[in-house]
C-alpha cells in the first residue's frame, strides 16, 4: 500500500479528519487514509452555516459504495460554510482529499489544536493500522 499522505500545515484527529487553520478559520476534511479505506464516495451530508460543532463530536456523514461513516470535528466552533460542491461531486474527496474541505469553522480554541496529531504522528498512527 502506498504511504499515506499527510501534508505539512495540516493537523489530524485519530478518527482521520484533518484541519487546516487559515487565520481565524479552520477548514475540515477527511484524510487520504480515510478516503482510501472508504472507497468510492457517493454522498456527503454536511451541516448548514450557523450550526455549532464540538471537538471530536459528529458533524455529518459520509457514504461510500462500501459503508456510511460519521464525520467528527477535529475542532469545535461555528460552521460558517459547508462545501456545497461536494453535494454535486462527492468523489472529489477521493481524488483530492486535502483540497476537498467539508466545513469551515470559526471560534475554535487554539488549545484544541494541541489535542491533534502532527503529520508525522498521524503517519505513525496510520502505519500501525495498515
UniProtKB/Swiss-Prot annotation:
**Assigned GO CC terms:** cytosol; glycine cleavage complex
Keyword Cell wall biogenesis/degradation on entry: no
Domain (Lipoyl-binding): residue spans on this chain: 25-106
| Cofactor mode of binding and number, as noted | Binds 1 lipoyl cofactor covalently.
> What GO biological process terms are annotated to this protein in UniProt?
glycine decarboxylation via glycine cleavage system
Tell me the residues on which N6-lipoyllysine occurs.
66
Output the CDD domains linked to this UniProt entry: GCS_H
Q: Does the keyword Transmembrane helix apply?
A: no
Pfam families for the chain: GCV_H
Keyword annotations for this protein, in alphabetical order, are: Lipoyl
Cofactor needs: (R)-lipoate
Q: Which InterPro entries match?
A: 2-oxoA_DH_lipoyl-BS (IPR003016), Biotin_lipoyl (IPR000089), GCV_H (IPR002930), GCV_H/Fam206 (IPR033753), GCV_H_sub (IPR017453), Single_hybrid_motif (IPR011053)
UniProt subunit comment: The glycine cleavage system is composed of four proteins: P, T, L and H.
Q: Which HAMAP family match?
A: GcvH
What does this protein's UniProt record list under function?
Answer: The glycine cleavage system catalyzes the degradation of glycine. The H protein shuttles the methylamine group of glycine from the P protein to the T protein.
Assigned protein family: Belongs to the GcvH family.
Q: What is this protein called?
A: Glycine cleavage system H protein
Which species is this UniProt entry from? Leptospira borgpetersenii serovar Hardjo-bovis (strain JB197)
- Upper lineage: Bacteria, Pseudomonadati, Spirochaetota, Spirochaetia, Leptospirales
Amino acid at each position: 500500500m502506498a504511504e499515506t499522505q499527510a501534508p505539512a500545515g495540516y493537523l489530524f484527529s485519530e478518527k482521520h479528519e484533518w484541519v487546516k487553520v487559515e487565520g481565524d478559520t479552520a477548514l475540515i476534511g477527511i484524510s487520504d487514509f480515510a478516503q482510501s479505506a472508504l472507497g468510492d464516495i457517493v454522498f456527503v451530508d454536511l451541516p448548514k452555516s450557523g450550526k455549532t460543532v464540538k471537538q471530536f463530536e459528529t458533524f455529518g456523514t459520509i457514504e461510500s459504495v462500501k459503508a456510511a461513516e460519521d464525520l467528527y470535528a477535529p475542532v469545535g466552533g461555528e460552521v460558517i460554510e459547508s462545501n456545497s460542491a461536494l453535494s454535486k461531486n462527492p468523489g472529489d474527496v477521493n481524488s483530492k482529499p486535502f483540497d476537498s474541505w467539508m466545513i469551515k469553522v470559526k471560534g475554535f480554541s487554539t488549545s484544541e489544536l494541541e489535542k491533534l496529531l502532527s503529520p508525522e504522528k498521524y503517519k505513525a498512527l496510520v502505519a500501525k493500522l495498515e
